Amino acid sequence: MALTYRGNVGDLKYTVTGNIATNKNKVVDLAGSDDIISNGGDKIRFILREGEPIGSFYGYKTDGLYTQEEIDAGRFYTFGRIPNAGDIKYVPQREDVKYYGDLEANEDKSHAAISGEDRTIIGKDVPDFTYGVNLNLQWKNFELSVFGQGVSGTMTAFESEQISAFMLNANPREFHRGRWTQENPNPRAIYPRIYGGHSLDDYNQYFSDYQLFDSDYFRIKSISLGYMVPINVVKSWGLSSLKLFVTGENLFTLRADDKMKDFDPESPSGRGLSYLGSKSVAFGVNVSF
């Protein structure tokens, strides 16, 4: 849907155009097949499930990072091993899973274990809405044009930055300073406890909503300010017309998730190796003889 409104206030003329589109989809029939789980990268998982939208992320729900107090009190779940402070706190989806410290002495330790059965849909990478706005203002010899666009209702997963932020070609950015350490035992730290080695099977590397970013954004894609030199002045210079202008691209972006501040919200889910989108400013002159 698109709407345009034109008007003027004295010498000021304006045109405002807005558009919005929605994308609603769901898997209707898998022809008798079970859920289809696919690998979108090193660890990213997608699921096709009847009644759910295409592009649904499939993984573990989390609740921050474990504190040392929780570990000491036995208020944790195992996931292949006993976690340490600073490890991701995976949340079981099965009702019969207990805290490790609540198990009876002779009880099976698997009753406190997270497993693949605890995976669930944790988000999607297809936006609910895409929208844009275009503003044009004219006042005497000046003209201002602004174009912005954004999306709402979508998530992004960056494997390199969340799963292996300090290896290969990943961009560490704020992860080094904001990661969990014994000196910074923040249960909501941007990156969990770090372990040595080169294994992608580390406790903190299972695909989960801890690795998802809210990628809703609104970006000023372009802004242009122009000035048309008065015709009497131009003619005295032997010209037909002369316009001076300055144009900027990608100068300003609003993000729903502060964790996205070092990433380009227009990047798709995947490796996440690219740096922020470039900004540019250009000055120009249009001359007619």
Describe the residue ranges of each PLM region.
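Residues on the lipid-exposed face of transmembrane beta-strands in outer-membrane beta-barrel proteins
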Residues: 1-5, 133-139, 223-229, 235, ...
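Residues that define the transmembrane beta-barrel architecture of outer-membrane proteins
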Residues: 12, 127-131, 216-221, 277-281
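Extracytoplasmic gating/loop element in the C-terminal half of outer-membrane beta-barrel translocons
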Residues: 151-243, 248
